[in-house]
C-alpha cells in the first residue's frame, strides 16, 4: 500500500515584495484640503491625509517607504497622526533623485504619490528607466500630462485621487500594488512507502 501526499503550491502572497512607497513631501503638500468632515474647523493638509491613508491601508503595512522633496530618504514608519501634524513639507519635487535613491536601495517597482510636476521631466524620465511605477496624483486639476506619460513609459499605472475623499486615495493605493506573486509550486509528487 502506498501512502502519498500531494504537494500543494504555497498560497499566493498579497505582500508587495519588491515594491516600495514613494511619498511626495515637497512644499505644496502643506496646502490644506477643504473638508466637510472637519470636526474642529481645522482643514487637514495634503500631507496629513497622505500619511493617514497609508497608515489606514492594511496592504501598505510592512512596505518600505521613502519620502522625497529636494532629497529622498527611507523612513522606518509612517508618521503617527500626532507626528504628522508637526511635519513641515518643504522643497521641490526632485523625482530624478527619488528614483535614483529607491533603485540604489534595490526597488524597481514603486507606488509614487505626488501632487505636482517634477523639477525636470527629462531627468525624471531618464532616472525611471528600468522601473515600474504606480502613480497616484493627489493635486488640483489639471493633471500634469507628464505623470501619465511617465506611467506609460514605465509600463505602470496612473490614478487620480480626490483628497477631499480619503477613501479614494486608500483605494488607489490598493489598486497600485503589484498583483500577488506567482510562486513556483514545490517539485515532487507522491511519497511512496
Predicted features, each with a name:
Residues 86-89, 116-164, 170-174:
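VWA/integrin I-like adhesion module and closely mimicked acidic/polar interface patches used
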Residues 19-21, 112:
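Residue-level marker for buried hydrophobic side chains located in beta-strands
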Residues 24:
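Residues that scaffold, gate, or flank divalent-cation-dependent active/transport sites
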Residues 164-193:
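C-terminal "exit" segments of structured domains
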Residues 17, 61-62, 106-108, 131:
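Short coil/turn segments at beta-strand junctions that form active-site/ligand-binding loops
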Residues 1-14:
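Negatively charged sequence features
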Residues 16-19, 27-65, 87:
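…and closely analogous acidic/polar surface helices at protein-protein or active-site interfaces
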Residues 51, 64-121, 138-148:
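Von Willebrand factor
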